[in-house]
Structures are given as C-alpha cells and as structure tokens.
Amino acid sequence: MRYALGVEYDGSEFQGWQQLGEHGGPSVQATLQAALSSVADAPIQVVCAGRTDAGVHGECQVVHFDSDARREPRGWMLGTTARLPPSVAVRWCVPAAEDFHARFSARARRYRYRLLNRQIRPALYRQTLSWERRPLDAQAMHTAAQALLGENDFGAFRSVQCQALHARRNLQAITVQRLGEVVEVQVQANAFLHHMVRNIVGSLILVGTGEQPIDWIATLLAGRDRTVAGPTAPPQGLVFIGPLYPAEWHLPAEVTQ
C-alpha cells in the first residue's frame, strides 16, 4: 500500500535531504527511512517532492512510500515521529493512490527565505534566519523580482553544479515584504534549479542595498550569465514550504492547490 507523509525538519544538522552514501554525512532521507523501517519492521524507501541542500529546512516536505505492513496512518505518524530525532517530525500521514508520486504529481513548489535586517547578528534564531546588516529596501526588491515571473531561462540563477537538462522554469509568484526587522521572500514555481532561490535572493539583496538598480534583475535574467549575478545567499534562511498538488489526490489542504 502507498502512503503520503508530510515531514517537517530543521536542516541545520543534516547534509541535505538526499542520502549520499555511507560516508556522505547525515541526511534527512536516511534518518526518515530508518525510522519508517523500524515501524514497518522491513526496509522502507521514500521519494520526496523536492530535495533540499545542507542547512535548508522543510516546513511540509511531502514523501511517498510503499509498505505491506498493517499500520493505520496515525500509527505511521506517531510511531515514526517517536523514532526520529527532535529535529524531524511527521506532521501527517494519509493513504495515497497507487499512482501518486510525491515528485511528479506536484503542480508547484514553494520556498520562503528570511533575512534578519539589522546591525547586530542573530543569536537566538541564527539557524533559521540569514543576516544582512545593510539596510534593505524591501519594496525595491519586490518590484525588481516581478521581472522573474513567467516561464524563463533561469541560467543566471542556477548553480554551476546544477544537473538539470535545461534552465527553463515557470516562476508563478514571488513576493518580498518587510515584517519588522525581517525581510521575507516567498517564491512559487513549477520546479526549481539547484540553488535557484538562494541565487535570486543574493541578487535581490544587491538591489535592496541600492548597489544595483531595480532593472538589474531583468538584465540578469535576459543575460543568463551566472558569473555576473549576485552571490548565493546562505542556506539557513531558506525553508521549503512544500509542494502543491491537484485536489484529485485528496491530500491535506496545506499541500492542495
């Protein structure tokens, strides 16, 4: 039987979502699979909606897995969470259709990036906020970001290690707003390239400080040259909010579009 899980995690202590082999360091995937396998008393492999890098967090990562073990969804949720470290929790578990796929059934994916914008670095939230001491104009950043909307080649914002066959993605929404001392960027797209959100944020920061004009983001997009764009923003400010699926899959409302 196939199940879908909603998983929350603090990525600070992990080398990313993906299991990288015996000597690749701790991963969220390996940690979750070990807990699920313990509940099932059999090996379990999971497939996720979107992989995250080292230090990046997950608010509602969606995974699917198959198991013949006779467990109720509540049993999977509570039993697995009891076997996980404090940094990982299963938020929900539901039966899924046999043809549901956590990655390929998703219609969109959403990320949030938060910057603490003040002179003094964060102490309490240093693992979940990035930090920029220079004053940022969030409205200028928001205006500049609108140039990225639509289906475009995001070559200027892809990592040099990106293994995607092409850089075309459909960016469906992007907002930048100030919430007190925090500047928050939210992005939704059909899919993302490696480091795409962090590279976009790194370039938007230069607009926010006034080092670059508002139309610079449009120029970068058209030029498709990663070497002239801004630096990659640090990982700790990034959260994978989660994917969005069509209602036909009957998943919880927070991941249904």
Curated annotation (Swiss-Prot):
Keyword Magnesium tagged: no
Pfam families per UniProt: PseudoU_synth_1
Enzyme Commission number(s): 5.4.99.12
Alphabetically ordered keywords of this record: Isomerase, tRNA processing
Molecular functions (GO terms): pseudouridine synthase activity; RNA binding; tRNA pseudouridine(38-40) synthase activity
InterPro entries referenced in this protein's UniProt entry, alphabetically: PsdUridine_synth_cat_dom_sf, PsdUridine_synth_TruA, PsdUridine_synth_TruA_a/b_dom, PsdUridine_synth_TruA_C, TruA/RsuA/RluB/E/F_N
Catalytic activity of the protein: uridine(38/39/40) in tRNA = pseudouridine(38/39/40) in tRNA
Active site positions, chain numbering: 53 (nucleophile)
Presence of keyword tRNA processing: yes
Any one GO BP annotation for this protein: tRNA pseudouridine synthesis
Matching Gene3D superfamilies: Pseudouridine synthase I, catalytic domain, C-terminal subdomain, Pseudouridine synthase I, catalytic domain, N-terminal subdomain
EC category name: isomerase
Binding-site residues, substrate: 111
Top-level taxon: Bacteria
Matches recorded under NCBIfam families: hisT_truA
Similarity section: Belongs to the tRNA pseudouridine synthase TruA family.
Function: Formation of pseudouridine at positions 38, 39 and 40 in the anticodon stem and loop of transfer RNAs.
Quaternary structure (record): Homodimer.
The protein's name in its UniProt record: tRNA pseudouridine synthase A
